[in-house]
């Protein structure tokens, strides 16, 4: 069953975010992930103001997602992330395919 990373973020360092994106994208692909949403326009139908940016990444499973997040490949991106952006990161499991 697919699993998703939902990231609400605000960029603090425009140069650092490009470095982070490059490293993160390579590590995501290596673990079978793919971007579904990457900073497109967002609107709010209910609730508070929208986050500055939203990113959604799909992985084949929650196990694979957790392997990616704990991986040495992504650890390098996390080092850059700490100074490049603030974020809230959510992991969520998808629903089984409809039959």
Features from the language model and the residues they span:
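Short S/T/G/P-rich N-terminal loop/turn motif that feeds into the first structured element of a domain
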Residues: 1-54, 59-70, 93-99
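C-terminal structural segments of small proteins and small subunits
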Residues: 62-90
